[in-house]
Amino acid sequence: MEQVVIVDAIRTPMSRSKGGAFRNVRAEDLSAHLMRSLLARNPALEAAALDDIYWGCVQQTLEQGFNIARNAALLAEVPHSVPAVTVNRLCGSSMQALHDAARMIMSGDAQACLVGGVEHMGHVPMSHGVDFHPGLSRNVAKAAGMMGLTAEMLARMHGISREMQDAFAARSHARAWAATQSGAFKNEIIPTGGHDADGVLKQFNYDEVIRPETTVEALATLRPAFDPVSGTVTAGTSSALSDGAAAMLVMSESRAHELGLKPRARVRSMAVVGCDPAIMGYGPVPASKLALKKAGLSVSDIGVFEMNEAFAAQILPCIKDLGLIEQIDEKINLNGGAIALGHPLGCSGARISTTLLNLMERKDVQFGLATMCIGLGQGIATVFERV
């Protein structure tokens, strides 16, 4: 079986969805920009030699509809002979795109693929056109489709206080801002055109979603966002609304060596699981355990973790039940996470994997794990091994 390697991984800056830098930039253009950039950064691979493009996107309508993967590839002037498909596993879409490409390579059906994902939540809101079947409530809790209430449920089940959530959210912003100031994101962010507050076209090379002034005291003043009577989850402890894209160049190890391209990491194992939709945010726990089992590893073998921060109330129970609560500051989301950077749904799986690869290199660790919860009760995880 072929070994699957990550040759390169990049992303756009994360832009605020409301009046942000990408308010006049379409999702297809964000995607095409990264496709072009990956190919330009790795000229040894001819674009025509790509076997397929796998691109995650959740709200596949309006500018994100009609197979955005193919639309973006055509805009990027990828040869017409290269196919492209859009993948949807809700929040895990671009990580699923990676898994799909990896399996094609493992089976020998592909040698080189572009993978990634995008979501422009400013142009296509998360709730746009959603119409849940009324009979769904016969099988799952009525609130299972309301992500904020599933986070409230997890917080109550696991004893996660409002204070704990506020502290974690403040940490996310502080670490993301520190990473920005130190240049830790420089290797992963591709400068991307957008408009500043005055409408001036410029190149952005930083995440504008981060709020460096965030404090626990300020967060404590916010009202509950989903359960106004007894809730603890606020807008400040939820993932920010942002627009962005991320992309990876995935190849067989043999093809990478043939082309003289240095792999950054191998895909050691992959897993996806289902869980109760009422506690959808718990999905990373069984997904991570399954991925580790497949890799023949334990939690203690993993040097750094990237866990998508849908909500502080959601990620803290996952950290606790993976036995990592005492190691948060050594291993978990060391450059902050989605609370500070935002969670552009179809982009996030590739985004956290890209950030993880850079952290693995910076911390000089052998193994890293990226994992995310998924709406309606799923979890997805990937174990990476540095080459």
From Swiss-Prot:
It holds the Pfam family Thiolase_N. It comes from Escherichia coli O139:H28 (strain E24377A / ETEC). Its EC number is 2.3.1.16. It is an enzyme of class 2 (transferase). Its main location: cytoplasm. This is 3-ketoacyl-CoA thiolase. Belongs to the thiolase-like superfamily. Thiolase family. The active site is at residues 91, 343, 373. Catalyzes the final step of fatty acid oxidation in which acetyl-CoA is released and the CoA ester of a fatty acid two carbons shorter is formed. Pathway: Lipid metabolism; fatty acid beta-oxidation. Keywords: Acyltransferase, Cytoplasm, Fatty acid metabolism, Lipid degradation, Lipid metabolism, Transferase.
